[in-house]
Design a protein with these regions (language model features):
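Acidic, glycine/proline-rich low-complexity segments that act as flexible tails and inter-domain linkers
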Residues: 1-62
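Conserved alpha-helical segments that form or flank metal/cofactor-binding pockets of metalloenzymes
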Residues: 48, 62, 66-69, 74-91
């Protein structure tokens, strides 16, 4: 099944997209997955989104394993299979 929004490959990114991509993969995430990848079509949106996500996931007062557990609790509550899949390994 083809994605609804074509996902940009690294080799096809323009300069602005590449800057945001490099920020994401060189940071604590280490990889680019999920809807943030589609957001790269708008580099400003993707950059703001990744910055907010980084603060919410990596810069809280909770220890990392409890932060991941909180994400899983929210994912389960909202039946978010994507969030569960992304975060289950880290919890």
């Amino acid at each position: 099944m083809a994605p609804r929004i074509p996902l940009p490959g690294v080799e096809d990114m323009n300069d602005a997209q590449k800057v945001v991509y490099d920020k994401i993969v060189s940071g604590p995430r280490g990889t680019l997955v999920g809807p943030l990848r589609a957001a790269l079509h708008n580099p400003l949106l993707a950059d703001c989104w990744q910055a907010l996500g980084q603060v919410l996931r990596y810069e809280t007062s909770l220890p990392p394993h409890l932060n991941e557990l909180a994400i899983l609790v929210a994912a389960r509550h909202w039946n978010s299979e994507l969030e569960w899949t992304i975060h289950a390994g880290a919890a």
